[in-house]
Regions:
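Cyclophilin-like peptidyl-prolyl cis-trans isomerases
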Residues: 1-147
Length: 147
């Protein structure tokens, strides 16, 4: 998984801690059928359930799912442990493409990488320092395609 969006990151010094930039508001959780945490999903980060039981999304931080492939047995374990139910389509995608199914229904997915999944893997593989920040900054540029 790769994460970005902190407004402080544009001018951050090497090694500076990121992730606590504020815009002063959150966005209500929105769980849409058909949008789930398959590899390449674009989702909103958020604070944990202890301080955010409404699962409201960050107004600025996002992540892109990388994830591994999942066998039927492992998906069944996720269903049992987290009380989730996956459609046959989701099970097929998680088995072939991969993702992070245990996050479904807990974090808002609002888009996906439609081209360049190999870039997600390359970004996820860069050497990182403390707090999982890349030693050399990786700048991401995104284009929004509306359907």
């Amino acid at each position: 998984m790769i994460q970005g969006g902190d407004p402080k990151s544009r001018d951050a010094k090497p090694g500076q801690m990121l992730g606590d930039g504020e815009l002063g508001y959150t966005i209500p959780a929105e769980f849409v059928t058909g949008l789930y945490h398959k590899k390449g999903a674009l989702a909103a980060a958020r604070q944990g359930d202890q301080v955010n039981p409404q699962k409201a999304s960050s107004s600025y931080q996002f992540y892109i799912v990388q994830g591994n492939t999942w066998t039927a047995d492992r998906l069944k374990m996720v269903e049992d442990r987290y009380g989730k139910k996956f459609t046959p389509e989701q099970a097929e995608v998680y088995a072939t493409l991969g993702g992070t199914p245990f996050l479904d229904g807990d974090y808002t997915v609002f888009g996906e990488v439609v081209e360049g999944l190999e870039v997600v893997d390359k970004i996820a593989a860069v050497p990182c320092g403390p707090m999982d920040r890349p030693i050399e900054d990786v700048k991401m540029k995104m284009t929004v395609i509306e359907r």
